[in-house]
Structure formats: structure tokens, C-alpha cells
Regions:
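Well-ordered alpha/beta subsegment
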Residues: 81-85, 91-97
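Non-catalytic, conserved peripheral segments adjacent to functional cores
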Residues: 1-84, 101-102, 107-108, 113-130
Length: 130
């Protein structure tokens, strides 16, 4: 398996539930947080790997599919619950697709942005992971 699902602690309340992410929820120090929203119908995001950075993706609203490849195997994971996070380790190719209308993908990253950490060509990625 080239990924791990993380349970996000949830506080149930009749007025609305609360998802709680604290230091021990995520297996790394979070150095950057961003989110994807208003993704047009049929659009894909991702299409890259990271040499060092790790991420947790959470479907805060709606749903989307995450296609993960490690050069040998391929997994497709549907995210559609705000109390489940998808841990993606470094050196894993990822593509996000099939975004539902109004979906929001929250990303927690282990590192700040660095273009040098990206592998943006799948051919280059396959060479890198050999």
C-alpha cells in the first residue's frame, strides 16, 4: 500500500461537528497549509511528485479522487469525508481528479514551497524512483 488513511478526531455536536487537527494527529510538523477550491468540472490537479515533502489531503467539502503511483503500482482513493485524511509520503506521484461541484481539498504539507522539490514529468519521476 502506497498511502495511509488518517482518522481526524471529530467532536460530534447537535449544532454541527468539529474536526480537530493537533500536533499528534499528523505524523509530521505542518509547515504549510493550502486548499484547492472552485476546481472546474473535468479539471485535474497535481500531476507531480515531491522528493522530500509529505502531505495530508482532506476533503473538507464534496469529493474527489486521488490517483497515486509509485512506479510499480497504482491506487485510486476517493476522499469524501472531512474526518479522514490521506497521507502521501515523498516520492509518490499524485493526480487529483473527478472533483464534485463545491468540493474543497485541504492540504497539510511537511515543508514550505520549494520548486526544487517537485518532479513534474512522469518520465523523469520513473527514472528518479528506479
Amino acid at each position: 500500500m502506497i498511502y495511509k488513511i488518517i482518522d481526524i478526531p471529530k467532536i460530534n455536536n447537535t449544532k454541527g461537528n468539529i474536526g480537530v487537527i493537533e500536533n499528534d494527529t499528523i505524523p509530521f510538523d505542518v509547515k504549510r497549509v493550502y486548499y484547492l477550491f472552485d476546481v472546474p468540472s473535468g479539471a485535474k490537479r497535481g500531476g507531480h511528485a515531491h522528493k522530500n515533502l509529505k502531505q495530508v489531503l482532506i476533503a473538507i467539502s464534496g469529493s474527489f479522487d486521488v490517483v497515486l503511483k509509485d512506479g510499480k503500482s497504482k491506487e485510486i482513493i476517493t476522499l469524501n469525508r472531512p474526518d479522514k485524511g490521506l497521507l502521501i509520503e515523498n516520492n509518490i506521484w499524485r493526480e487529483l481528479e473527478n472533483f464534485s461541484s463545491g468540493s474543497v481539498c485541504l492540504v497539510l504539507a511537511s515543508e514550505e514551497f520549494s520548486e526544487e522539490d517537485y518532479i513534474r514529468s512522469y518520465k523523469e519521476y520513473l527514472h528518479f524512483v528506479k
